[in-house]
A protein has these predicted regions:
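Positively charged, low-complexity terminal tracts
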Residues: 1-82
Length: 82
């Protein structure tokens, strides 16, 4: 697993050693967990279709997301089959 990020106003992709997600309450943590469960299902379907990779954004999944809020992106890269 590799972790990447951007500075708040930056455009340069940075490879990170670790990342912190600070939740203001269990509701936000539950939202992330629900998002990850849904991503797992969607990415499993993409793997079955033999897609080389897929990605999902929290902003596309969360209908309460507002411009300017942080996004959380999950990328799954699937190994090529012989």
């Amino acid at each position: 697993m590799r972790i990447f990020g951007y500075q708040k106003d930056g455009q340069e992709l940075l490879e990170l050693r670790e990342a912190t997600i600070s939740c203001s309450g269990l509701d936000e943590l539950d939202k992330i967990i629900d998002f990850l469960i849904e991503v797992r299902k969607e990415h499993a379907l993409e793997a079955e279709l033999m897609s080389p990779m897929c990605h999902s954004h929290l902003r596309d999944w969360d209908n309460t997301w507002k411009k300017g809020e942080p996004d959380f992106i999950i990328v799954s890269e699937f190994e090529s089959l012989p």
